[in-house]
């Protein structure tokens, strides 16, 4: 099964080797027929502490690294 890859914005880098990434998705509301934005926060592993708040990054699903962390930062420069 292929690993999921998501694009999001770093909202926190206070933890060591961990960043919190907010991923927004857009969908049509079934009743209102209106485009709605929803966001979700993922904890991702950042081995070298390269990411800063506001960076647009790609995260990829991986094995569980800790209780809450099962994503890893793939690339912080190419995500646009």
Swiss-Prot record:
InterPro entries: NA-bd_OB-fold, Ribosomal_uS17, Ribosomal_uS17_bact/chlr, Ribosomal_uS17_CS. Gene3D superfamilies: Nucleic acid-binding proteins (2.40.50.140). It comes from the Bacteria. GO terms for molecular function: rRNA binding; structural constituent of ribosome. One of the primary rRNA binding proteins, it binds specifically to the 5'-end of 16S ribosomal RNA. Part of the 30S ribosomal subunit. This is Small ribosomal subunit protein uS17.
């Amino acid at each position: 099964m292929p690993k999921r890859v998501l694009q999001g914005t770093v909202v926190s880098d206070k933890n060591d080797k961990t960043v919190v990434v907010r991923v927004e998705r857009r969908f049509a509301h079934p009743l209102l027929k209106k485009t709605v934005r929803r966001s979700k926060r993922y904890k991702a592993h950042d081995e070298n502490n390269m990411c800063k708040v506001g960076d647009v990054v790609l995260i990829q699903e991986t094995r569980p690294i800790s209780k809450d962390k099962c994503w890893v930062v793939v690339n912080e420069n190419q995500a646009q």
